[in-house]
């Protein structure tokens, strides 16, 4: 059985499968055929500790990831990483997009340390930070190309990591978001600035959803959907007060949607 692990940054549960008014129709359609975990919580409200806990099955104080990987924190034992474990047990392991368990996202040495046999990740040099949703799209295209030629005789673990919905958000509000009707989540003040900020988040979520839908469509077109466990999740809450970096429900409550054939 193949495993497709799709993960986002800073999305919390602010997506349509969880009742949020977010333009994430592809994810909502997928959720209708999957298990939607409504009480999923991450092990830490910051990026690297949360991801390291999920991918090692151990708490941050056990695995050593007590802060952000790009600031010098790391796992005590990288052999505990899921990609390492699966690679030792017959899986071809593939990384496309971000990882946050070793160094910075595009650390050239990190994929091998984490246990990935193959790296598909595009260069991000041509993109400004607020344009990284386009980088996510380029990586989605690379995932799709890889799925077209995947070896049917060799199970794979493919990690597709998106920068979305991390700040800074796209500057232009997409057509799928009508800023006139956007409201920031409680307890954020409702004013012109916060409504615009929320519209930018929803725009980021829209682009994330388009990339998610593209990958799932190719998985199906390649005849692999019924041979693949698909896991969608995020690391922690949205980058807002009382959310990300906070031990509140909105800080550690995460989206977790899994489809098992």
What is the predicted role of each segment?
Residues 1-261:
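Formylglycine-dependent sulfatase
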